[in-house]
Amino acid sequence: MIDRYKHQQLRIGLVSPQQISAWATKIIPNGEIVGEVTKPYTFHYKTNKPEKDGLFCERIFGPIKSGICACGNYRVIGDENEDPKFCEQCGVEFVDSRIRRYQMGYIKLTCPVTHVWYLKRLPSYIANLLDKPLKELEGLVYCDFSFARPITKKPTFLRLRGSFEYEIQSWKYSIPLFFTTQGFDIFRNREISTGAGAIRDQLADLDLRIIIENSLVEWKQLGEEGPTGNEWEDRKIVRRKDFLVRRMELAKHFIRTNIEPEWMVLCLLPVLPPELRPIIQIEGGKLMSSDINELYRRVIYRNNTLTDLLTTSRSTPGELVMCQEKLVQEAVDTLLDNGIRGQPMRDGHNKVYKSFSDVIEGKEGRFRETLLGKRVDYSGRSVIVVGPSLSLHRCGLPREIAIELFQTFVIRGLIRQHLASNIGVAKSQIREKKPIVWEILQEVMQGHPVLLNRAPTLHRLGIQSFQPILVEGRTICLHPLVCKGFNADFDGDQMADHVPLSLEAQAEARLLMFSHMNLLSPAIGDPISVPTQDMLIGLYVLTSGTRRGICANRYNPCNPKNYKNERIYETNYKYTKEPFFCNSYDANGAYRQKRINLDSPLWLRWQLDQRVIASREVPIEVHYESFGNYHEIYAHYLIVRSVKKETYCIYIRTTVGHISFYREIEEAIQGFSQACSYDT
């Protein structure tokens, strides 16, 4: 569908019977209107040709072979000199056979039928709008209750008795005895509303704006009453308030989308194009058909039977008509969603029929497998691994994938630089993996983003753009902070990478889809690029440090008296004095030289404001030197003072892990400050 702003989009929702008729009907050149499927047949068993007005009719859905009608005549497609443009004998137009992929038909239902998605799925939209129990509506739809509110506005017999008479069940059997067949039909059509027709009449009488106003008034009244003290009654009030909120939201959605509630009851049933429910001939001359065809046949059989009961036979009992209407309703339910009402329908081999819902839903459905997850050109797939050295907006592509994705660009670069005379020579150089190929590939990748997608794509952050760089191996490297948007982790997840080709796609990838521009959740606005799983464990290990406190000097771990119940090996526990460092670079150098460990405690000289130090804090130890200087040792810092109590310097007790983490935070803050200063 293309809207007025020329945006191509796919919208799934309710449509009016007029819209279904407009989609399915067409006027052939002789003025005849075709589109209604009236026969439950597919192909003739002798001629092996589609039956007229059947599920594969060429008059309705188009020719099987382009330019060839059902009679076998041939016309050139698009030739204006060819006249006529359709076969006068069979009525088939001379058009392309691809029309059978999108040309729809329809079945005109003799009785209205409720759409099972909106009746049985939870929450039930029909039950919410009508504010009635679902079981009550099901009994009405499937003709278990035959008395409904009168559809006429005149004072009648049933209006005096009220609606939905359950107490006097004998009425269901006694009233037909007092009327002749014709009289009962008149009475039934006027005063008794049953089946989906009763639902449609009630939905048509709804005023959505009044529903919103009344629901809001009732919700406010329930809120003003307050708790009753009875737990059961309070729960009922809470459930009622939640129901009113859902009802108001549903009514607002119907108003906002210009959808009428009675459209949830079907009068015209669309028939899918034949190419979407094919019949295929396999080895041995056997035919393999889609289950949708059998379900359509069942609907047409039962609908035609109901038509015959109402038109050809006037002496048909009303109970038989109601029973046939129930069968039509059940057949349409099975077509739309098999098994939603309980036991699914099976074929002769005890295999469950695949309904329309089964075809489109799930991982192997039409949308996720054929449309969203289909194989496309200029794309690849591989396992993702962590790339801790990558920037947030970069990803690492394996050479094997990158050369395939950007092969056309590399070929163009080789020819432009006169390194290859034609495409064949350029491809041979790529196969030989010459060094110049990787240089050109690097140049191409610098100005071309790629899109990474992880299925299922449940929201817009499921596909983001990155600046690719070449990496060794056969896995895609990814920054761990972007994993939450993809709902991915590094336990074997796979991602697909795509190359945006058009200038519009590249501009969209750079301006809207880069990972560093999607830091907040589009749903709730919370930060989505936050550390998770491996990063949290790594930060904990980096900053945990040793469990020994400042008193480790006093309580030496190699002293066996401190561990009476444990066996201490002197080779494993060697007491070393905590070293002093003037700056963080010396500490990192000592770590790289393996003189200290990542979690080894050390003293680092630090420019710390003395006002941070609590004045009432008492040092744990004081070490005096021979010249009078002394060290005041606290839990987390050390102060060197002179004889005159002047502060020479301050050391903090930390680890190499703490230092590395602090430097990363400091560099990030400085980079953010510089970026803000550039913007201002």
Swiss-Prot record:
Mg(2+) binds at D489, D491, D493. Pfam families: RNA_pol_Rpb1_1, RNA_pol_Rpb1_2. InterPro entries: DNA-dir_RpoC_beta_prime, RNA_pol_asu, RNA_pol_N, RNA_pol_Rpb1_1, RNA_pol_Rpb1_3_sf, RNA_pol_Rpb1_clamp_domain, RNApol_RpoC1. Its EC number is 2.7.7.6. Its cofactor is Mg(2+); Zn(2+). GO terms for cellular component: chloroplast; DNA-directed RNA polymerase complex; mitochondrion. Transmembrane segments: none annotated. It catalyses: RNA(n) + a ribonucleoside 5'-triphosphate = RNA(n+1) + diphosphate. Binds 1 Mg(2+) ion per subunit. Binds 1 Zn(2+) ion per subunit. Belongs to the RNA polymerase beta' chain family. RpoC1 subfamily. DNA-dependent RNA polymerase catalyzes the transcription of DNA into RNA using the four ribonucleoside triphosphates as substrates. This is DNA-directed RNA polymerase subunit beta'. The lineage of its organism: Eukaryota, Viridiplantae, Streptophyta, Embryophyta, Tracheophyta.
